[in-house]
From Swiss-Prot:
It is found in: Nucleus. This is Homeobox protein goosecoid. GO terms for biological process: anterior/posterior axis specification; brain development; dorsal/ventral axis specification; dorsal/ventral pattern formation; neural plate anterior/posterior regionalization; neuroblast delamination; otic vesicle development; regulation of epithelial to mesenchymal transition. Belongs to the paired homeobox family. Bicoid subfamily. Keywords: Developmental protein, DNA-binding, Homeobox, Nucleus. CDD domains: homeodomain. Gene3D superfamilies: Homeodomain-like. The keyword DNA-binding applies. Residues 146-205 bind DNA. Residues 199-240 are annotated as: Disordered. Residues 225-240 have a biased composition (Basic and acidic residues).
Amino acid sequence: MPAGMFSIDSILAGRPSCKDSVLLHRNAPVVFSNLTESLYTAAGDFNGLYSHTGPPAPNLQSVNGRIGYNNYYYGQLHVQGPTGPACCGAIPTLGSQQCPCIPTGYDSAGSVLISPVPHQMMSYMNVGTLSRTELQLLNQLHCRRKRRHRTIFTDEQLEALENLFQETKYPDVGTREQLARKVHLREEKVEVWFKNRRAKWRRQKRSSSEESENSQKWNKSTKTTSEKIEEGKSDVDSDS
């Protein structure tokens, strides 16, 4: 078994986007991402971990020994009973509109929204064996975005970047490449840094402008109040 079978990269690489979630009706299969045959070969060792219940759904074709349709591969997932998945049945007070397994707008609990699962993790699964919490966790695992690697700049790199930013807010490609070689960074990292730095600079400029306007309004208001007080004193003196 490959050591990297369950690494984060291998798991995330096999996942389609959350937009590929499909609405499954009772006795319908769950759609798996269009993975390479090598993944299916490696996943064969895990077929015994999950029960394969029921016959394949109609209108499905066999592709290389796998059940497939429209460039998707299918693993059997059956909703138990016409009343909905087990997660809804476990809590009698939850109707089809309240159960998180059922998308809003569907009036039948016999349909359930399940996100595609990487085939190398789960060949076959029965929704009746999963609780509502497990279904939610499965969907969160699929939809969770991969975190981007954040670059940590050294003091020397930041100083060089800031110095160039004071000279020009929009350095051209050649200037960015020259600076990147100087501080041992990729040009793409320098470009992103300048993009973020310009956004910060605009926020600071806007904040400073708002503070200046507020200060002017306050000074004008104070001046008007002082003038009214002086006018009041003058009126009192004239009356006396």
